[in-house]
Amino acid sequence: MDGSVAKGTSCIQDSQSSSVIANTDATLGRHLARRLVEIGIQDVFSVPGDFNLTLLDHLIAEPRLKNIGCCNELNAGYAADGYARARGVGACVVTFTVGGLSVLNAIAGAYSENLPVICIVGGPNTNDYGTNRILHHTIGLPDFSQELRCFQTVTCYQAVVNNLDDAHEQIDRAISTALKESKPVYISISCNLPAIPHPTFSRDPIPFSLSPRLSNKRGLEAAVDAAVTFLSKAVKPVMIGGPKLRVAKACDAFVELADSSGYAMAVMLQPKGLVAEQHPHFIGTYWGAVGTSYCAEIVESADAYLFAGPIFNDYSSVGYSLLIKKEKSIIVQPDRVVIGNGPAFGCVLMKDFLSELAKKIKKNETAYENYRRIFVPEGTPLKSEPNEPLRVNVLFQHIQKMLSDETAVIAETGDSWFNCQKLKLPEGCGYVTNNSLSAWYPFYLQTLEEKSSCCRYEFQMQYGSIGWSVGATLGYAQSVPKKRVISCIGDGSFQVTAQDVSTMIRCEQKNIIFLINNGGYTIEVEIHDGPYNVIKNWNYTGLVDAIHNGEGNCWTMKVRTEEELTEAIATATGEKKDCLCFIEVIVHKDDTSKELLEWGSRVCSANGRPPNPQ
C-alpha cells in the first residue's frame, strides 16, 4: 500500500496505527481535546463557569491545545468565528445557559457566514436530568432544555452528552457534521463526565473520514450544456462572485472560468478578497450604486450574468435596488444551478460546474473591453493643510499603504465596510480554502502556512452584529500569528465588546487597531437619525492603557491630524512592531464615505416601505 488517499477523502492517519491510551487519559474530556486537535484546532476560546471547570481541566491537559480565556462569552464566540475564517474551524467553551445564551448571538453570526464553529457547553450533572430539581444558571424550571432549543435554529447539529456509553459517537457525529455542513454545532457535556475513563476512549480515535460530495454526472453535463447555450447567445456577458464561493470551495474554479472565458469579473462585497484583485479582467466590487466605480454600469448593462454563490439581501442589494433581471442570470449555488427562469439543475456542485464550464465556454472579452473604454481612475483625497483635522478618506489612504502579504484586514460593521471595500488588496490576496480538511491533516498546517502568505479581508455583512470585530480580531490573529491584523473599528461598536483587547495583550498579539472616534453610531445615523445614535465619548486610549496596566506589550496614541497619523503608523510599524498598537483616530461626526450616504438612504427607504394593502 503506497499510503495515497483518494482525492477529497479526509483521513488523519491509518486507523491500524491507533495506539492504546493510558487509563488516566482515556477520559471524555481528553477524547474531545484530541478530536479538536485532529481537525486543526490549536486554541479554544473559553469563559469558565462551574459546569465546565472539569472539562476545561481535561482540555488544557492536552499539550497541543491552548485555552484562551476571554472576558465574556460573546467575545469567545466572535473569536471562534474569526479563528474559523483563517483556519477553517473554531471552537469555544462556555457554561450552561448563562454562558450558552450569551454566546448564542455569536453562533448565529457564524451560522449566517457558513463557518464551522464547535460550541461546547458544560451541562448539568447527569443525576439531575429527569428529576424535578431546579438548578442555578437556569430560568427556575426543572426543564433543562431551554438552552438546547435556542441553539436548534442556529446550529446544524446538537448533541447532549449525559451518558458515557454514546458520548464517543455523539461527539464524533457533531464534529463531522460541522465540517461537512460548514455550520456551527452545539455540544453539551454533563459536568460530572469529563474526568471519567471509558473503554471507548482507550485508543487513539479512528480518523474522521469525510467522503467527498459528488455531482450528479448527468445533471452536471446537462447544466454545463445549458449554460454554454445560454451564454453563447450573449454579446457582453459578465461573471460575479458571491460569498458562497467560500463554503463551496470554488474560488479556484471561479478564477479558472474567468481565465478561459475572458469575461469581465467582479465580486459582491461579502467575498472581497476571495479572488485575486490583480486578475487581468477584474473590474471591482459589485455593490450596486455604492460599489466600485463603473462596475455596476458594466454588470447591469450586460445581457447575461453568471453569479457564483450570491446572497441578495437588503444590505448587499442596497435596499433591493440592484438592476438585475432573473431571465438574464445564471445563478450558481454550492449544489444547484438555475439558468434564467429555468431550467434548474440539482445535485451539481459549484466547483465542478465552473470547472467544466471553463472547458467548453467560448472566449468573449466584450464586457471587459467596454469597461476599459469607460474607465477613469479614481482620484485621491484632497491634500491636507498643515494641522488640518484628519479626514476618514485620508486615514484609509494611509491604511492602503500598510497592506502587504503579511497583513490581514478586519472591518467592523459600519462605515468601515464602505471604506475598506475601496482598499486595493495587494498581489497574492485570495481566500485560503481549507481543502486540507478534505485531505491528510499532517499536511494541514504546512498548507495553511504556505497559503496564508496573502493579504486577507474579513467582515460580517449578513448578520452585521456591531462589536463583532473585536473578538474576530482576537481569534483571527491567534490562528495566524505570523500575520499582522489591521482592524478598523467604530467607537460605537467598540463600546459593545472592548474588554477583549485585554485578551489580545495577554496573548501577545501584535494587531494594529484603528479606533475611529466620530461620536456615535454613524451607520445608524445615515439610515435613521435620532438622539439614540449619540453615545457617551470615552477616553479610548486611556481605557486601553488601563486594561494594559503595565503588563504585556501595548502602545496607544490619539491622533487628530494627518501629521500625527503618519507618526503613529511609523511607530506602530517600526519601533512598536512587536506590540499591540491602538490608534484612536478622532474625526468629525459627519465625516462619512459618500457610499454610506447613498446606501443609508436606500436602506432607509426599504425599511420604511408601508404595509401591503390587505
From Swiss-Prot:
Molecular function via GO: magnesium ion binding; pyruvate decarboxylase activity; thiamine pyrophosphate binding
SUPFAM superfamilies: DHS-like NAD/FAD-binding domain, Thiamin diphosphate-binding fold (THDP-binding)
Alphabetic keyword roster: Decarboxylase, Lyase, Magnesium, Metal-binding, Thiamine pyrophosphate
Binding site for substrate: D50, H137, E524
GO terms for biological process, alphabetical: aromatic amino acid family catabolic process to alcohol via Ehrlich pathway
Region span, Thiamine pyrophosphate binding: 415-523
Tissue and organ distribution: Pollen.
Annotated EC: 4.1.1.1
Reactions mediated catalytically: a 2-oxocarboxylate + H(+) = an aldehyde + CO2
Record's keyword annotation contains Lyase: yes
Record-linked CDD domains: TPP_PDC_IPDC, TPP_PYR_PDC_IPDC_like
InterPro entries: DHS-like_NAD/FAD-binding_dom, PDC/IPDC-like, THDP-binding, Thiamin_PyroP_enz_cen_dom, Thiamin_PyroP_enz_TPP-bd_dom, TPP_enzyme_TPP-bd, TPP_PDC_IPDC, TPP_PYR_PDC_IPDC-like
Family affiliation: Belongs to the TPP enzyme family.
Subunit structure: Homotetramer.
Protein name: Pyruvate decarboxylase 2
Biological source species: Nicotiana tabacum (Common tobacco)
